[in-house]
Structures are given as C-alpha cells and as structure tokens.
Amino acid sequence: MYTSGYAHRSSSFSSAASKIARVSTENTTAGLISEVVYREDQPMMTQLLLLPLLQQLGQQSRWQLWLTPQQKLSREWVQASGLPLTKVMQISQLSPCHTVESMVRALRTGNYSVVIGWLADDLTEEEHAELVDAANEGNAMGFIMRPVSASSHTTRQLSGLKIHSNLYH
C-alpha cells in the first residue's frame, strides 16, 4: 500500500500539537462548578444532558461521588445508564446543611472526577467561591442539582456553565 509523505508530516504535526495541548492543560486549572436547575416533573431532561458527560468522566481512574438527600441510586440504573458501577460512590441521607461542606472536602481531594450534590436553596457567593476553589484544587467538576416545581423559576444564577436548551422552554 502506498502512503504519501504528507501523511507522515501530518502525523508528526498532530503528535507535536497533542504535546503542546497536554503541556498547556497541565498549566491551567480545569475545575468547574455548575448549578443545574431542573423541573421535578421532567427529570429525564437532566439525565439526557448530564449522562454523556458522566459517562465520559467514568473513563477516568477517579471516582464519581453522589451526595443524595433521600433516594438511593439503584445498581440497575447505574449500569443501564452506562456509568461504571465500580467507580460510583454514594452517600445518601445527607443533611442539606452538610452537603456544601462535604462537596468542598471531596472536590479538594482530587480523588473524584465529579461530585454531585442536591440542594434546595441557592448558594451564597461565599459557598460558590469555596466550591470553585476546591474544584480547581482537585481538578474536578461539581454539580449542584436543584429541583424546582413546574410553576416556579429562579431569580438569579451565579456564574458558571449555563446550558440553554429549547427542551426546557
């Protein structure tokens, strides 16, 4: 089979480009905190948005931590969702007053690729800043899940990832 010299040049270029990308990502922080406000009557929409990201993060060697207030994750759901059962940890029955503190501690360790916590109330600016610092320090992602009823809406949102979708409007 014939291969041109161009193919060899492009592969050496892509090798150099990947080396530069790797060095530049090592020098930047990749932590992220995002508040995900979802309607209680449409939980599948949130799953459709977050599952691909969680599946990708599941390929890392780190754990995924779920801090749930009441419900327990079922093994069947975790496996059916394509998440690695051996890398998913859950702490349930966690009091809302301990959720932010637990998230900060977990994010800071660097042992988790993602930490997901449920909160009914808005974060204070201090709590948000503390979570952002912890996520940056641990190079991790944190998601604050906030269910709202279909009739209510939020008045403000702190800076972070905003996902706009026609499915929610």
From Swiss-Prot:
This is Cell division inhibitor SulA. Residues 162-169 are annotated as: Lon protease binding. It comes from Shigella boydii serotype 4 (strain Sb227). Component of the SOS system and an inhibitor of cell division. Accumulation of SulA causes rapid cessation of cell division and the appearance of long, non-septate filaments. In the presence of GTP, binds a polymerization-competent form of FtsZ in a 1:1 ratio, thus inhibiting FtsZ polymerization and therefore preventing it from participating in the assembly of the Z ring. This mechanism prevents the premature segregation of damaged DNA to daughter cells during cell division. The keyword DNA damage applies. Keywords: Cell cycle, Cell division, DNA damage, Septation, SOS response. One of its GO terms (biological process) is SOS response. Induction: By DNA damage, as part of the SOS response. It holds the Pfam family SulA. The record marks 169 as: Essential for degradation by Lon protease. The keyword Ion transport does not apply. Residues 106-112 are annotated as: FtsZ binding. Is rapidly cleaved and degraded by the Lon protease once DNA damage is repaired. Belongs to the SulA family.
